[in-house]
UniProtKB/Swiss-Prot annotation:
Family as reported in the entry's similarity comment: Belongs to the bacterial ribosomal protein bL19 family.
One biological process term in Gene Ontology: translation
A Pfam family it matches: Ribosomal_L19
GO molecular function: structural constituent of ribosome
Function: This protein is located at the 30S-50S ribosomal subunit interface and may play a role in the structure and function of the aminoacyl-tRNA binding site.
GO cellular component: cytosolic large ribosomal subunit
Domain of life: Bacteria
Protein name: Large ribosomal subunit protein bL19
Keyword set, alphabetical order: Ribonucleoprotein, Ribosomal protein
Organism the protein comes from: Syntrophotalea carbinolica (strain DSM 2380 / NBRC 103641 / GraBd1)
NCBIfam families: rplS_bact (TIGR01024)
Amino acid sequence: MNIIDRLEMEQMKKDIPAFKAGDTLRVHVKIVEGDKRRIQVFQGVCIKRHNKGLGSTFTVRKISDGMGVERVFPLHSPNIDKIEVMMVGRVRRAKLYYLRKLQGKAARIREKRSL
């Protein structure tokens, strides 16, 4: 392991829950407006996850006022307060780009049931 890998390992967050594409997430993001700070919650379906060490990202999609909104979050960003997994989805793909074309009930994802 070289110096760069060691520095990246130190900066990675340890409290990230296990999630994948298809899961419904609630992401708490720190927002700074002037001298005020607040937490904004973004809830939606994870449509993709890109794992590459410190540069890992995930994309969350939600429907807001009839418009699809997608937001890309860096996984190890200090601006992310916490990530909550609300529902584990049952999908057969790693990238759910097909959800962009679907509307209404067709865009629903089945819930994975545990026995």
